[in-house]
Amino acid sequence: MKHRVITVSREFCSRGSEIASLAAAELGIPCHDSDIIDKLAESTEFARDFIAENGEYAVYRSRLFELITARDFTGQSAQDRLYAAQAELLRQLAAEGSCVIVGRCAEYVLRDRCDLLRVFVRADMASRIDRLAEKNIDAGDSPEQYLKDRDARRKAYYYAHTDIEWGAGANYDIALNSSLFGAETCAGVIAKLYRKL
């Protein structure tokens, strides 16, 4: 079977990670998601918690000044160094063989590959709020605002590192609505498209 890579970007709590995992299982290829955090924690200066919070999300405003002013001798912030290490790891994972990579600007980092299927997963707000509750995530008084804030931070992170709008249709080969089709159907569509690459 030919070497191919799937990238899955997703709205927070849209079941994108689940869909990526299901598609990878159907295709018999690895899915790289939270293991990316573990690999980076082992191979870089960064703690796992820092990677989890800063590997896909722009910093909170209260931490912005600290991170802007905390630059090394090359002028890079910790988040810049993390992005560079993460991008290098994504290129290594893609070079090793067929796989699914979730988030982390992967479709941008791997944009020069001709064997790439770029997917975006979204869901309606009610489904995302339900998913938030299923995952027992403390969203405070406003789950909807929590989800909007998480997506806004992803969007800001993506733009800061790519100069491209996160979620814009032109950046993906297909966008799927998981609340309309369900996780299994979305995964099946991805697997079918992968086989046609």
Describe every region a protein language model picked out.
Residues 1-6, 65-76, 83-84, 88-91, ...:
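Domain-scale detector for complete catalytic domains at protein termini or as standalone homologs
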Residues 30-41:
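Short beta-strand-centered segment that lines the nucleotide-binding/catalytic pocket of NTP-utilizing
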Residues 8-24:
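Glycine-rich phosphate-binding P-loop
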Residues 87, 183-191:
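Short, amphipathic alpha-helical "lid/cap" segments that border enzyme active or binding sites
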Residues 41-98:
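ATP-dependent small-molecule kinase phosphotransfer cores
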Residues 89-136:
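ATP-dependent NMP and nucleoside kinases share a basic, alpha-helical "lid"
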Residues 2-11, 97:
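Pre-Walker A (Motif I) flank of P-loop NTPase domains
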Residues 58-67, 139-184:
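Small-molecule kinase domains that catalyze NTP-dependent phosphoryl transfer to phosphate-bearing small molecules
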